[in-house]
Amino acid sequence: MQQRLIFHVDVNSAFLSWEAARRVAAGEPDLRAIPSAIGGDRDKRTGIILAKSIPAKKFGVTTGEPVGMALRKCPQLVLAPPDFALYTRNSRAFIAICRRFAPVVEQVSIDECFLDMTGTHLLYPDPLAVAHQIKDAIFSELGFTVNVGISENKLLAKMASDFEKPDKVHTLFPAEIPQKLWPLPVGDLLSVGRALAEKLTAARIRTIGDLARTDLAYLQKLTGVRTAALLHNYACGVDPSPVLAEPEAVKCYGNSTTLEQDVTTVPQANQVLLALCDSVAARLRADGRRCLCLTVTIRGSDFKNRSHQRRLPEPSDVTQELYDCAKSLFAEFWDGRPLRLLGVTLSDLTDGQTQQLSLFPDEKRDRARKLDQAVDQLRGKFGPAAISRGPRPPPTHRLHCKFTPKPPDP
């Protein structure tokens, strides 16, 4: 069987790099070379940090912290507003360059993708050399840097790309696991979040090597059977998942937005929920799907997510129906504390042709559906910004509920 060769390409501090590249092209100072960040309002000292430069990181500025706190750490911090249209253009551009080199490319988030380079040895006999070619082509043509990780599977390639940054190429082949992977803290392993890392550390499983050497039966008692199997495989560098050129079957649709200013009232939250429902319902209709379950997610200043979900009486793709459900659900579990993130996810999908009973009176539902159709047609002709129902917050996470290594690394 032919040995696999997988690359993982990850944009370095994507949001900030893309804004910096635009400014450099216009003859302005490079944000990457000074203490700078994306997000929030400097004058009002509101919002949160979405991305930061390496010089800002040296002052202790962290992604996700309030702008006011970041400015106290670094008074000279240069703040730039987010521009998601710019991010989308740059994302498409760097993926297009990757496709010039690889027969199979799987984009897993706005700023990262996997390349299956298996069988390309006649074209590219030296994997390191072609990885540098890809990295250098992206920088020379688009003006921003990436890291490239190289291995025999997606997991190890992803872990390799997270080694020293920026503008680096790293390998992590199976023979290198004891030296490069196992000494890392267990929290650095893909799929190990903060809570799980704390649990493992409390059980004296402090490094990835400790995890690889842990008895599977003990690990099952600690984390559960399925999680234990996944963790043990990942710690040993085992990941058979393929690089998929075509998207996996979508199991749910979701959008969430990190807010520039905290939401503190129900009307503010409802405006955001309307924009999110409008966006995600349009994607649902475009794919000819309907949903039976809606989930609302919130995050406060403690950075902990809370979610509640509700089943709909019948499958729906109508924006107003989904918005009404989201409003009601939000009102049930929000405790009034300021919010920094809101999200809406639609799941339990059915074919769009599935017969629906009427949630609204027929006439009301027909009007709502015709409104959706008119809005979809206008956006299809003039672009997504042609019409909006309420203010549209920029989505920081657009979910299709398939496997992705992690959310974008801003």
Regions found by a protein language model. Name each.
Residues 12-14, 42-45, 301-304, 349-352:
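Short, charged/polar surface micro-motifs in flexible loops or helix N-caps
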Residues 66-73, 103-112, 206, 241-253, ...:
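Short, compositionally biased low-complexity segments
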Residues 314-410:
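Acidic, metal-coordinating catalytic segment for phosphate/diphosphate chemistry
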Residues 114-119, 307-310, 356-361:
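Short, hydrophobic beta-strand segments
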Residues 1-236, 282, 365-410:
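Gly/Gly-Pro- and Ser/Thr-rich, intrinsically disordered tail segments characteristic of DNA damage-repair
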Residues 152-155, 233-236, 290-301, 339-350, ...:
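A glycine-rich phosphate-binding loop feature that marks nucleotide/adenosyl-phosphate handling sites
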